[in-house]
Regions:
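Short beta-strand segments at enzyme active-site cores
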Residues: 2-9, 92
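Short, well-ordered beta-to-alpha junction loops that form the rim of enzyme active sites
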Residues: 8-10, 69-70
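Active-site-adjacent betaalpha module
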Residues: 15-146
Length: 146
């Protein structure tokens, strides 16, 4: 598999995502494995004032597969920033989530962002690719010849 980089948001003291608090902890099923990295950020953009770009350049990464929490904030901002940094961006359309907002349900927000990313035009004819998790796993299976 490819390298996994866990991006974790750090809030100010007293915030929901204050480092060390229960809300900040990664889900037990999402613990980094040996060789994975963790990047901590304080803004929606995972590239802004973090070591993410350096880690990716160090490994000669040119394609990112993105998933995560807060579709309408951190995920959207990072998708756009990754594209602006010239990466080939693939988003797991069933691999990002958010909460209901006063004006839209979480489901509507996710549907809107999947549509928007699919139709976002980038320089040089590049596009953001959206796949389901099943499609990604199917594409990653080695071909068998008998």
């Amino acid at each position: 598999h490819g390298r996994v980089i866990y991006i974790q948001h750090d809030d100010l003291p007293g915030g929901e995502l204050e480092p060390g608090t229960p809300g900040w902890q990664l889900h037990p099923a999402l613990q980094p494995a040996k060789g994975d990295s963790r990047v901590r950020k304080t803004a929606c953009d995972s590239f802004l004032e973090t070591e993410l770009a350096f880690l990716l350049a160090e490994q000669s990464v040119d394609r990112l597969i993105l998933c995560g929490s807060n579709t309408d904030f951190c995920v959207d901002t990072t998708v756009r920033s990754a594209a602006a940094h010239g990466f080939e961006v693939l988003v797991l359309q069933d691999g990002h989530t958010t909460a209901d907002r006063p004006h839209l349900s979480a489901e509507q927000i996710i549907e809107h962002h999947n549509w928007m990313w699919r139709h976002l035009h980038l320089p040089e004819g590049r596009r953001i690719t959206l796949l389901t998790t099943d499609q990604l796993l199917e594409a990653a299976q080695p071909a068998l010849a008998c």
